[in-house]
Amino acid sequence: MTTCSLERKINLPVEKVWSLISNFTKSPAPEIKIEVEKEGDPAAGGVGTIRMLTIGRTRVREILDTVNPPHSFSYRIIGGTPTKEYKGKVTLEGKEDTTIFHWHADIKPIVPLTGGIVCMVAKGVINTFVDALEKHHT
């Protein structure tokens, strides 16, 4: 298992960042395409939601596992990556009018000894996601 993490400062209040990223059915920026495959509980965007997320040429299927408003959610990637297992968590920490965005993932790659490469690619996708948030909302 490979553990990956990333921390970014976003120049938006935590409530705004949460409103942009917590609904699994809505895209926070035009560069991020979301197709809902299955609605969650209690409604679309809730636990159990399955979506296809596209950022550039990267396409992954994700399922939302937990939501803890207004600061964290966890998810799994269930398709589109060279992994046997991928469990991710996003946590937001408010600091005055900014947000510290924490991302953590435990990744088990299909090919042994490639965890570092998979982690590097995942970090690139997460950075692109955060960059898009900042570009369109700050």
Q: Model-predicted segments: where are they?
A:
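Hydrophobic ligand-binding cavity/cleft-lining segments
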Residues: 1-43
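Hydrophobic/aromatic beta-strand elements that line small-molecule binding cavities or substrate pockets
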Residues: 6-8, 60-66, 86-94
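A short, structured loop/turn motif at beta-sheet edges
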Residues: 11-14, 66-70, 91-100, 138
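Beta-strand elements of well-folded, non-transmembrane domains
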Residues: 12, 81, 94, 107-109
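Glycine-rich portal/gate segments that line the openings of hydrophobic small-molecule binding cavities
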Residues: 26, 36-81, 132-138
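Residue-level recognition of conserved beta-strand positions in structured domain cores
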Residues: 64, 77, 94, 103-105
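A conserved amphipathic terminal alpha-helix motif
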Residues: 100, 106-138
